[in-house]
Amino acid sequence: MLAGPSGAGKSRLAARLHAAYGWPVVRLDDFYRGGDDPELPTRDLGGTTIVDWDDPGSWNAAAAVRALEDLVAAGTTEVPVYDIARSAAAGTARISAPPGSLVVAEGIFAAEIIGALADAGILHSAWCVRHPRWVTFGRRLVRDLAERRKAPLVLLRRGLALTRAEPEVVARMERLGATCAGPAEVERRLRTTRPSTNQTSTNPHTRERGSG
């Protein structure tokens, strides 16, 4: 499980883990609710009311947990493919996990389901990926502008707000059970603790197909 602030490098780390070990990746940000959902949380940003996409209420935690449980139990699951620029799902994709493989689940709200996955017995480990917060600010802004996720002024204001709030956000992830570390350290720890295909881990929260 890879949690962490927006722009911290979760997706890049997940891609490296997939390339190195073949572990399937579940993008938890694809479980955002649609922009037309009347229950979406809102916030004031410079006198303008906008959807608060940084509130866990904008995300479908129950659907994410079900997908991960199905993937571990059956070796396959269907997940949405979310278009952030349109604030809507653009389709679906099927993900498969071979026996003995870890599953890398990554997203800004990943920490919200640590407890549920541990209770289900499918949590291998949970990490809060982080950099110095102004490094994260710069990486996030460059990415969001390049992908045209929202209007530039909205992205700048949101980025500054997230940077100010980052210490509190990281502390919350730690309270929910995530261990904070840089991407290289997380990769090293996962490499040395990944389950063998020939034996089941003794960790009570791990199965051979566990969510990393």
What are these regions (language model features)?
Residues L2:
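Hydrophobic anchor at the beta1->P-loop junction of P-loop NTPases
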Residues P24-R33, P38-R86:
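Conserved nucleotide-sensing/catalytic segment adjacent to the nucleotide-binding pocket
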Residues K10:
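Conserved lysine of the Walker
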Residues L13, L17:
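Hydrophobic positions on the alpha1 helix immediately C-terminal to the Walker A/P-loop
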Residues S6:
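The conserved Walker
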Residues A90-R149:
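ATP-dependent NMP and nucleoside kinases share a basic, alpha-helical "lid"
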Residues P98-P99, V142, A161-G212:
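NTP-dependent small-molecule kinase module
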Residues W23-R27, A126-C128, C180-A181:
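Conserved beta-strand scaffold positions in the cores of enzyme catalytic domains, especially
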